[in-house]
């Protein structure tokens, strides 16, 4: 039996579900206020609308009765306590409105929800705190370590709900697996199952699907499912479909998921939310985000109600599709209005969405309200928050979140330590990173490649410590860890900063020999090494290699190239790099022109500087203090004080004044030149006035002594007059 003749012939998924509605979200700008920061918190990267009459993007805060499926508590005592809390909250929040807090406070707890825990204040994140800390030797509650990301935990939860990991004990399933392993080239599994009609049950079919999927025989799973559907009675079950959707999603076979979904039996048992959760998860894993959204919309049309797993998967899907945190929040509100219960995975996805956009304060609000509703944060949520603050270079907040997590009895994972080590590597504190690595091992956590990469980076960022970075690299290889592209990039950068461009290039060649593909960051580090050494030949060679390998450079890459060529007087090559900027869709920045000006000034090409300033104006680039300072020093160097004073005046008018120390030095030079210029001008003016009024003394010419050559005091050459 071939696939062409099977019932899995290509059909349109949309023939069964007329889905035409797409994601449409309102555009208005969203402002939040955080209880931790008394200032407006933006949920959008765009500027706020000037119109004050724009509609609110938030839905109603559910002042009306909840849906029928959710029972409201009838205890009058609880209601009175809630009303008192609401009155206190209203008194505290009269001066501002926080839509997130208002949403959470408006939600009525269901009878199945746990009571709110005691109010816990956030850890105090003080400024100017010490950067050193000590980890407690043990924890209150040794929980199971969770290393996965939020979306991975949702995927695992969905699989456990579907029963994918439930152990089986069946010899029939193993026989089917052996048949799948021993299929010949033109055979299908369905052709080999002629003797299994009365031997296998629907539970054993699910077991066979799981075993074949784990062994990589996904196509055989499709033929086996077709065979199951053709049996009388049919062996196809919602559980089998769920397992198959999960396996197809792993292999990114989204078309088969849609095909199977459109041909589901018209039975009530197949209208199972777990089945549709698996389909949405599989489509999301295949990066078919629009199709995943349409499946979710189809659920409502066939009266399949979403649950908390649906909500968690959908939040992760929207985030991966590039939707903003504002849009994700709207979906969460709508699903909450439908009576979907909240879970740890739902809030973990929300926190991740907000952190990815840099909305850390809003993510903290969500995390705090989550715990007040009885949903405890896990290690993954804290790792997400710590990583967001680390990327913003707020190491004190990272420390505070780590201490708060530890105080709550949560066990740090290897990912937690990697975030901490990366934070201290940014601060160029390798000693603390070494301490973290030892404490990590003492707690039984095995350092991974990222852990050692943070250590290499910490040494590499510190000048003259490339030998320690190389030692950390060798330690990583000694424990059996294979270096990654990031590891080699950190090592190359360490050599580059220390001036060892030969070692940097040797590491680059070793990386290529080991079959590790260099990233754009790796190429940029190698280019930086030769830029520092002034080797324009190697600079050009690496650049051409990048173009051959079709590696798209970043703005940092092009700025490195430009600076390397321009400082060596290769202005034509530097201009070619600027041209490549435009081809890649990258407009030159102020830093780009600052580098060009510095190179032209050092090369004695000060006449080119006003032209570069005009080019900046044509590109709507506003010169900064570095631009003006470069031009002023260039003209002072060639004693063109008139232009130096002119651009100093422009700098002051534009408000682009450098830092106090640099400006004090610049002012001292200009004032000294001004005094010298004033003295010369004063002497010249006095000379002109005296000449006009005839006050200039005439020079008297003395009478020439005709015997001057016979004066005794005149020096004569030795030996000229000899007796």
From Swiss-Prot:
Record keywords: Chloroplast, Plastid, Repeat, Transit peptide
Highest taxon of source: Eukaryota
Primary residence: plastid
PPR repeats: 272-306, 307-342, 343-377, 378-412, 413-447, 448-483, 484-518, 519-553, 554-588, 589-623, 624-658
A Pfam family matched in the record: PPR_3
Compositional bias segments (type: Acidic residues): 81-97
Biased composition (Polar residues): 713-723
Transit peptide: 1-44
Family according to the record: Belongs to the PPR family. P subfamily.
Protein name: Pentatricopeptide repeat-containing protein At5g50280, chloroplastic
Species the sequence originates in: Arabidopsis thaliana
């Amino acid at each position: 039996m071939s696939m062409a003749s099977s019932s899995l012939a290509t059909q349109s998924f949309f023939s069964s579900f007329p889905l035409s509605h797409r994601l449409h979200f309102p555009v208005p700008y969203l402002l939040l206020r955080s209880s931790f920061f008394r200032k407006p918190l933006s949920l959008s990267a765009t500027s706020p609308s000037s119109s004050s009459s724009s509609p609110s993007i938030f839905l109603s805060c559910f002042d009306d009765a909840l849906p029928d499926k959710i029972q409201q508590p009838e205890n009058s005592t609880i209601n009175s306590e809630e009303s008192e809390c609401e009155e206190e909250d209203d008194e505290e929040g009269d001066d501002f409105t926080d839509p997130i807090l208002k949403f959470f406070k408006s939600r009525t707890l269901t009878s199945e929800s746990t009571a709110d825990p005691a109010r816990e204040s956030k850890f105090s994140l003080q400024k100017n705190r010490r950067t050193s800390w000590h980890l407690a030797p043990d924890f209150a509650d040794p929980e199971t370590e969770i290393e996965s990301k939020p979306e991975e935990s949702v995927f695992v939860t969905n699989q456990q709900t579907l029963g994918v990991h439930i152990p089986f004990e069946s010899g029939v399933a193993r026989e089917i697996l052996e048949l799948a392993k021993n299929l010949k080239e033109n055979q299908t599994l369905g052709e080999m199952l002629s003797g299994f009609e009365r031997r296998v049950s629907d539970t054993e079919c699910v077991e066979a699907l799981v075993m074949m999927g784990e062994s990589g025989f996904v196509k055989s799973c499709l033929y086996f499912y077709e065979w199951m559907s053709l049996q009388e009675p049919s062996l196809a079950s919602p559980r089998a479909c769920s397992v198959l959707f999960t396996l197809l999603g792993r292999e990114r076979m989204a078309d088969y998921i849609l095909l199977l979904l459109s041909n589901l039996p018209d039975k009530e048992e197949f209208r199972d939310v777990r089945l549709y959760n698996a389909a949405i998860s599989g489509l999301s894993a295949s990066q078919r985000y629009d199709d995943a959204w349409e499946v979710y919309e189809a659920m409502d049309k066939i009266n399949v109600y979403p649950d908390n797993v649906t909500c968690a998967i959908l939040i992760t899907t929207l985030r991966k599709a590039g939707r903003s945190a504002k849009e994700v929040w709207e979906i969460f509100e709508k699903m909450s209005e439908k009576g979907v219960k909240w879970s740890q995975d739902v809030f973990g996805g929300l926190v991740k969405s907000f952190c990815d956009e840099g909305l850390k304060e809003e993510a903290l609000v969500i995390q705090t309200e989550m715990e007040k509703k009885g949903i405890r944060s896990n290690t993954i949520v804290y790792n997400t928050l710590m990583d967001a603050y680390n990327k913003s270079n707020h190491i004190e907040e990272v420390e505070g979140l780590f201490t708060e997590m530890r105080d709550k009895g949560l066990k740090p994972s290897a990912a937690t330590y990697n975030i901490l080590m990366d934070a201290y590597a940014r601060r160029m504190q390798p000693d603390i990173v070494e301490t973290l690595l030892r404490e990590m091992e003492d707690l039984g956590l095995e350092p991974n490649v990222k852990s050692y990469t943070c250590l290499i980076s910490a040494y590499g960022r510190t000048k003259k410590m490339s030998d320690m970075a190389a030692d950390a690299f060798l330690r990583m290889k000694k424990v059996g860890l294979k270096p990654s592209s990031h590891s080699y990039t950190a090592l190359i950068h360490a050599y580059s900063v220390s001036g060892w461009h030969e070692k940097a290039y040797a590491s680059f060649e070793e990386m290529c020999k080991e079959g590790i593909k260099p990233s754009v960051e790796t190429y940029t580090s190698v280019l930086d090494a030769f830029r520092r050494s002034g080797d324009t030949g190697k600079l050009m060679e690496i650049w051409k290699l990048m173009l051959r390998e079709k590696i798209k450079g970043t703005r940092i890459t092009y700025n490195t190239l430009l600076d390397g060529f321009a400082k060596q007087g290769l202005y034509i090559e530097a201009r070619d790099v600027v041209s490549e900027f435009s081809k890649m869709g990258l407009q030159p920045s102020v830093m780009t022109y600052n580098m060009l000006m510095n190179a032209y000034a050092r090369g004695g090409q000060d006449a080119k500087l006003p032209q570069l300033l005009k080019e900046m104006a044509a590109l709507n680039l506003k010169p900064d203090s570095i631009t003006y300072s470069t031009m002023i020093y260039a003209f002072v160097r060639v004693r063109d004080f008139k232009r130096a004073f002119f651009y100093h005046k422009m700098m002051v008018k534009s408000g682009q004044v450098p830092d106090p120390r640099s400006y004090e030095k610049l002012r001292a030079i200009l004032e000294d030149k001004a005094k010298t210029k004033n003295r010369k001008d004063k002497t010249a003016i006095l000379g002109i006035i005296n000449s006009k009024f005839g006050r200039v003394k005439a020079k008297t010419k003395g009478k020439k002594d005709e015997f001057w050559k016979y004066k005794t005091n005149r020096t004569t050459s030795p030996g000229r007059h000899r007796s």
